[in-house]
């Protein structure tokens, strides 16, 4: 046996040695009509979702489901809308393995390419990372839910061959889309940036250590807001590999100080107007990033007015100055939504809803949105959920302790049956 087969045998041995999976300990609370319900539903089966499921099972919380609207292999961005050739993160970082050496990317890579192959590897290819995540899921036997779904639209970049493309924005995803269009044969790609120059330093790289990962969510509001507003003004640069990917194409042009004054589409293409005047393109790619706004999440519509946002925690002028941060949900230490009014009828329901992802970044920092933090974030989430489940069922656990009867001295001459113990004491 060699290669991945040997590694998978090692994984099985490691998990057995770790007593995985442990027995399920939550007692479960049935629905009002008596039907059983899940202890945890994880919505999203990408990197964080599957790792959260694994962390819950590792903690003995097994009555769970992990669901995703995508088909297998299309969860998350890796095989769908991500365009970068390689990950931003260094190859040595861990996370989805939850501290099990045989489940690390390095173990998976070396099983196929040897130690020399690991030394030759510069950074992890995006699709290799996807293949690794799927392997981890299967090797750890932790696929805990069926996947349902229609995928995010996949752009056919082949349509851009010979075309003129405008890209609005100069962040990492903008460069990745520009590079993909150029490699697909686009004749000309013009990128427009509002800034006078590209950001130079990725400040979040200075936050990747255990103290920050574990401690940020427990800081007071003022200190967290200070970090948040500083990093909001210090945009992250695109990786140098993404920039060079575009620069090697003669049809690429990056224009600074170029705010769009107007954009108009017609049957023949798109007209973009800047201070330089109107320019014609065949298509436009918006690389402007994403926003976190609970008001636009239909699944949270019933809780929209009851949930607390960061804008409720800071001075009105601060909220007005940083509207993106102010819109973010204000989460508790266990990633749970918190109520504006603790006496609200929805307060209890909000405590059962936990957000692990970009929406949690304002409350928990990079613990909720990056490869280096996935292991810490998911184990923290599992621990907090376990504490909440235990507290909710503590009365029944007390009764179970009282009823627990596993006589240690039964094989000895000093064994006393329960009924005699009661009479004597």
Which ranges hold each PLM region?
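Dinucleotide-binding Rossmann-like beta1-alpha1 core, especially the glycine-rich loop
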Residues: 82-98, 109-137
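Flavin (primarily FAD) cofactor-binding/catalytic cores of flavoenzymes
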Residues: 1-70, 118, 122-184, 188-425
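Conserved N-terminal glycine-rich FAD pyrophosphate-binding loop of Rossmann-like flavoproteins
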Residues: 70-98, 199-215
């Amino acid at each position: 046996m060699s290669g991945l087969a040997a590694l998978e045998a090692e994984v099985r041995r490691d998990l057995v040695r770790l007593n995985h999976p442990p027995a399920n300990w939550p007692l479960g609370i049935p629905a009002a009509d008596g039907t059983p319900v899940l202890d945890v539903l994880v919505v999203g089966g990408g990197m964080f979702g599957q790792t959260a499921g694994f962390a819950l099972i590792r903690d003995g919380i097994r009555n769970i489901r992990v669901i995703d609207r995508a088909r297998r292999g299309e969860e998350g961005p890796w095989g769908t809308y991500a365009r970068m050739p390689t990950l931003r993160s260094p190859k040595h970082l861990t996370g989805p393995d939850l501290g099990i050496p045989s489940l690390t990317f390095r173990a998976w890579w070396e099983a196929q390419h040897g130690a020399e192959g690991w030394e030759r590897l510069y950074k992890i290819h995006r699709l290799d990372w996807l293949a690794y995540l799927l392997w981890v899921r299967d090797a750890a036997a932790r696929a805990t839910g069926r996947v349902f779904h229609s995928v995010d639209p996949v752009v056919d970049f082949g349509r851009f061959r010979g075309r003129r493309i405008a890209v609005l924005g100069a962040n990492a995803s903008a460069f990745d889309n520009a590079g993909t269009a150029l490699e697909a044969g686009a004749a000309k790609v013009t990128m427009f940036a509002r800034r006078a120059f590209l950001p130079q330093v990725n400040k979040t790289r200075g936050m990747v250590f255990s103290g920050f990962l574990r401690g940020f969510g427990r800081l007071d509001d003022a200190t967290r807001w200070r970090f948040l507003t500083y990093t909001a003004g210090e945009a992250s640069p695109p990786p140098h590999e993404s920039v060079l990917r575009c620069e090697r194409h003669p049809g690429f042009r990056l224009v600074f100080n170029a705010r769009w004054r107007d954009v108009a589409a017609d049957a023949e293409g798109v007209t973009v107007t800047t201070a330089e005047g109107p320019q014609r393109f065949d298509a436009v790619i918006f690389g402007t990033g994403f926003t976190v706004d609970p008001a636009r999440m239909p699944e949270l519509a019933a809780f929209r007015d009851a949930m607390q946002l960061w804008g409720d925690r800071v001075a009105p002028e601060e909220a007005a100055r940083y509207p993106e941060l102010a819109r973010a949900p204000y989460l508790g230490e266990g990633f749970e939504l918190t109520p504006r009014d603790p006496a609200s009828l929805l307060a209890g329901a909000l405590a059962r809803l936990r957000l692990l992802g970009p929406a949690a970044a304002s409350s928990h920092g990079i613990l909720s949105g990056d490869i280096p933090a996935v292991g810490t974030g998911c184990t923290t989430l599992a621990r907090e959920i376990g504490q909440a489940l235990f507290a909710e069922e503590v009365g029944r656990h007390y009764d179970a302790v009282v009823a627990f009867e596993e006589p240690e001295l039964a094989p000895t001459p000093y064994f006393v049956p329960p009924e005699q113990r009661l009479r004597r004491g």
